[in-house]
């Protein structure tokens, strides 16, 4: 009896409970508008804030808001995407072999995290070498003897800007290699760790290398983060689009709007720190903002013929959710949380530490709580 009930559910797809096609259709338009506006606003604030003092990426307000967004992304990976992948790949509509014989969700998440590390490393290497070649060509053209003068302590050479990176002491999204360079820089002098004063000739050379690494990191981080966000946004949009239940769609509208706004804020901050040209930044922002609404539109178009409980749909959803979880968890922990919370600026500012930790836990807690409804 139980097996026949399961077979009927797998063949029929969504339950008829609370099913209302016309009401669901109208709610999907509301969802598209709400999520589009939330995502666009979230990603636009850091980009516009580059020209506004209180919203600049060097400001404490931005750092605290980014900590909240990092908590949202971390909870999205652990609580929403990994849980969703586990639910899909353990669905009784799937055959026992191989899906019940191995913990595939955790495995796919691990593979995605390791692959992200590899892409992270290779991408950083590529951009660093590209920038070093550009600098070498510039020095050769201008005369290496004049360019090679060691800069005055505390100043930065304008030729060392990476991808248009602006001067300033703001927190940068850096990875393992850039952290190593930072520690070499910090330990090369014996005093002045938090007072902003540094001594020693090695610092002039470290600044140039650190700038190249930081600029490359900003570019790579923003691109990988967008990839991770877009990959799960499509699945989220499709899931909402194929649903014909207003009871399911209503809470999803609020949850996804909240989720999209703060993911957009984190992505916008990464794009802003990478100092992309306005055209490239606009394209990346629009691509992010349109992904989930596009998924909802596609899901709405195929809702009448789509069976969310078919083996193909479940496997696709489960694998993509698990892969997205691995990417998001890696990006949140390594490139957002660790990079900022282990930085010199954070360690030297107790108030910023407290506020950032509160915002981080608050973002993770609120996003986790949304799993009750969505």
Curated annotation (Swiss-Prot):
Recorded family membership: Belongs to the ZIP transporter (TC 2.A.5) family.
Gene: ZIP4
GO CC aspect terms: chloroplast thylakoid membrane
Protein name in UniProt: Zinc transporter 4, chloroplastic
Annotated keywords: Chloroplast, Ion transport, Membrane, Plastid, Thylakoid, Transit peptide, Transmembrane, Transmembrane helix, Transport, Zinc, Zinc transport
Topology Lumenal: residue spans: 83-101, 240-250, 304-318
Cytoplasmic side: 50-61, 123-218, 272-282, 340-353
Residues passing through the membrane, by range: 29-49, 62-82, 102-122, 219-239, 251-271, 283-303, 319-339, 354-374
Primary role: May play a role in the transport of zinc in the plastids. Could also transport copper ions.
Localization (cell): Plastid, Chloroplast thylakoid membrane
Chain positions covered by the region annotation Disordered: 185-206
Recorded superkingdom: Eukaryota
Induction: In shoots and roots by zinc and copper starvation. Inhibited by excess copper ions.
GO terms, molecular function: zinc ion transmembrane transporter activity
Membrane topology per record: Multi-pass membrane protein
Main location: plastid
């Amino acid at each position: 009896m139980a097996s026949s009930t399961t077979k009927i559910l797998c063949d029929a797809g969504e339950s008829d409970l609370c099913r209302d096609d016309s009401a669901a259709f109208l709610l999907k338009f509301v969802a598209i508008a709400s999520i589009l506006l939330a995502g666009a606003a979230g990603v636009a604030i850091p980009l516009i804030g580059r020209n506004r003092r209180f919203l600049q990426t060097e400001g404490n307000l931005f750092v605290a808001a980014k900590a909240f967004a990092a908590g949202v992304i971390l909870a999205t990976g652990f609580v929403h995407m990994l849980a969703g992948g586990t639910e899909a790949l353990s669905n009784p509509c799937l055959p026992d072999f191989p899906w019940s014989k191995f913990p595939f969700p955790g495995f796919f998440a691990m593979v995605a995290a390791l692959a992200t590390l590899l892409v992270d490393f290779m991408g950083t290497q590529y951009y660093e070498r590209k920038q070093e070649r550009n600098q070498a060509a510039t020095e050769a053209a201008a005369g290496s003897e004049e360019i090679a003068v060691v800069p005055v302590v505390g100043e930065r050479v304008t030729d060392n800007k990476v991808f248009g990176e602006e001067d300033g002491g703001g927190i940068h999204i850096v990875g393992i290699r850039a952290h190593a360079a930072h520690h070499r820089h910090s330990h090369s002098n014996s005093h002045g760790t938090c007072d902003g004063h540094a001594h020693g000739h090695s610092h002039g050379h470290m600044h140039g290398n650190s700038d190249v690494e930081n600029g490359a990191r900003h570019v790579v981080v923003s691109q990988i983060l967008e990839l991770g966000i877009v990959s799960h946004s499509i699945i989220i949009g499709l899931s909402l689009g194929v649903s014909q239940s207003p009871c399911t769609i209503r809470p999803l509208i609020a949850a996804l709007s909240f989720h999209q706004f703060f993911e957009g804020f984190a992505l916008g901050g990464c794009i802003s720190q990478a100092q992309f040209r306005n055209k490239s930044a606009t394209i990346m922002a629009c691509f992010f903002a349109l992904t989930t609404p596009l998924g909802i539109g596609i899901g709405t178009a195929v809702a009448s013929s789509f069976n969310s409980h078919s083996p193909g749909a479940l496997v696709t959803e489960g694998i993509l959710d698990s892969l997205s979880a691995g990417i998001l968890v890696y990006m949140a922990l390594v490139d957002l949380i660790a990079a900022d919370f282990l930085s010199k600026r954070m360690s030297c500012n107790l108030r910023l530490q407290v506020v950032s930790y509160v915002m981080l836990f608050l973002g993770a807690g609120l996003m986790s709580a949304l799993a009750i409804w969505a």
